[in-house]
Amino acid sequence: MSQVLLVTTNYWPEPTGIAVYTTDLAEMLQTEGHRVTVLTSLPHYPWWKVPSEFAHLTEGTRSHDGVEVIRANHLIPTKMNALLRVRFETSLWRNLRRVSKTKLGNDYDMVIACIPTVAAGIIGKKIARSLGIPFGLIVQDLSGAGAKQSGLRG
């Protein structure tokens, strides 16, 4: 049985695209016999806040459908522009990094990062490199929507 670390910004209970995909991926790997840990953010998308029904999903470790889920606190802007996008990504990076150093073990066989956020990719790669294990990157979205939400044109 291999031990997989999935690093992503979007995970259950978020109801849209990337969270649905990463949740299905983690649960499928777990069903296939792998031990899966997810390092993720607070549930915030598409609401840009933590809804009251998910307020109990604060920073810390919990299990959901057999998958260990480790969440990190972070800035959640209520509106998005270019500056707030940078602050959001920076907050994700700092807090995922901090939590990865205090809550994760070193017994993983591989790290998978699922992005559109740069933070998840960077943290996943650094963890894999520090443990000397394989790293996989799934590019789910190239942040075109993020650029549009931030008021950037291209």
Residues covered by each model-derived region:
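N-terminal subdomain of nucleotide-sugar transferases
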Residues: M1-T61, D65
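Structural motif
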Residues: Q3, D109-M110
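Hydrophobic residues in well-ordered beta-strands that form the structural core
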Residues: L6, V38, R71, L137-V139
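Acceptor-binding helix/loop patch of EC 2.4 sugar-transfer enzymes
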Residues: T9, P13, P77-L84, L131-G154
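Short, well-ordered alpha-helices that flank and scaffold nucleotide-derived cofactor binding pockets
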Residues: T23, E27, T31, R98-T102, ...
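Residue-level detector of anion-binding/catalytic polar loops
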Residues: R35, E68, P134
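A conserved catalytic-core segment of Leloir-type glycosyltransferases
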Residues: T40-K103
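An aromatic- and histidine-rich active-site surface loop
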Residues: R85-R97, M110-I133, L137-Q140, G144
